[in-house]
Amino acid sequence: MAVKDVKKVVLAYSGGLDTSVILRWLQTTYGCEVVTFTADLGQGEELEPARKKAEMFGVKEIFVEDLRETFVKDFVFPMFRANTLYEGQYLLGTSIARPLIAQRQIEIAEAVGADAVAHGATGKGNDQVRFELAYYALKPDVTVISPWREWDLTSRTRLLAFAEEHQIPIAKDKRGEAPFSVDANLLHSSSEGKLLEDPAVAPDEIVFQRTISPEAAPDVATEIAIDFVSGDPVALNGVTLSPATLLARLNELGKANGIGRLDLVENRFVGMKSRGIYETPGGTILLAAHRSMETITLDREAGHLKDSLMPRYAELIYNGFWFSPERRMLQALIDESQHSVTGRVRLKLYKGNVICVGRESPHSLYDTRVVTFEDDEGAYNQSDALGFIKLNALRLRLGAQIGRRGGAL
């Protein structure tokens, strides 16, 4: 679709520097009506300034929606049922938010009769892929505008100059400087850019927004209990809470105990490596609790199969394939494994650490009678192990015999 053919576009709008510049750029370059959509995913910011900024630039249709419960219930919790970590470390706080934003953006575009959607992701990052794969999965004929791939504002310096020229307010950090590139929601916050672009440079404490330093955390552990039903957390310290409220409370506890910091160099889907500082206090606690719950409720082979599939599942979410058939297939398998993951986990939070100190479940596969060092009263016949060992040793013995005759093992 040519520039002149775009009459109305729905912009995923945070109210930050990038999307505020994009809003004005769309108006001046495309000459089209811009509809803004701001999703409240628990980023912890007052969203009214985003509305006022949009009004300042003459936007008539402004959508600001509270999606926190939907975000946690339908996106975060399903992901945590899989104990999802990208490259063994990243809890996917940014990745998991994009499908929901894109989904609602497409719904709004159809409702207001827009002929295009736009986002503020750069041409170097993963988010452009995540947004657009979701757009096309939900509306195959959608027109997508990606300003970072079109305009000549190819650096933060040029972006700031454009903002000053068009009188776009520029946020400052605590030192009065332009802020890091930040993404935040109820699950996490991330910081990138500036001095963090050098992976050898340690981040200043000012970078961290969601956690205190573990060194500054209390000298006494905080003890908590999390209740699970079918793989999802439902209560904290015996009090039933909504998904978003529970995660928010875990964030508070994690923050106070210095939990959830990660300095990560990751492999982006587009091919380059990038460095980010991630803070996921509540998610780090939740992951430890869920894994502990599974240790007594999942069958060994079922658990090992699930663990073997997790990296692929994580990769699909990281790369933007939330709405793909393969992600849905894996989700069905993961959810099937969670029917018995019900019970209570007790944890200690201490100076950046999450320590499981107890777990119990009505579906526990842990049988004290079988595993005890004391008299098991015939629950387990130790002599049965002889045949088990001999059968498992058979191929090793045969291989060793061949090896002695000069053959290959």
Curated annotation (Swiss-Prot):
Please give a single GO biological process term from the UniProt record: L-arginine biosynthetic process
Q: Which domain of life is it from?
A: Bacteria
- According to the record, the signal peptide region is none
Q: In which pathway does it act?
A: Amino-acid biosynthesis; L-arginine biosynthesis; L-arginine from L-ornithine and carbamoyl phosphate: step 2/3
- List localization entries: Cytoplasm
Q: What class of enzyme is it?
A: ligase
Q: Which Cys-Cys disulfides exist here?
A: none
Tell me the residue numbers annotated for binding L-aspartate.
T122, N126, D127
Write out the residues that bind ATP: A12, Y13, S14, G15, G16, L17, D18, T19, S20, A39, G120
This protein's UniProt keywords? Amino-acid biosynthesis, Arginine biosynthesis, ATP-binding, Cytoplasm, Ligase, Nucleotide-binding
Q: What is its EC number?
A: 6.3.4.5
| NCBIfam families membership | argG, PRK00509.1
Q: How does it assemble?
A: Homotetramer.
Family per similarity comment: Belongs to the argininosuccinate synthase family. Type 1 subfamily.
Q: What is this protein called?
A: Argininosuccinate synthase
Q: Which organism is it from?
A: Gluconacetobacter diazotrophicus (strain ATCC 49037 / DSM 5601 / CCUG 37298 / CIP 103539 / LMG 7603 / PAl5)
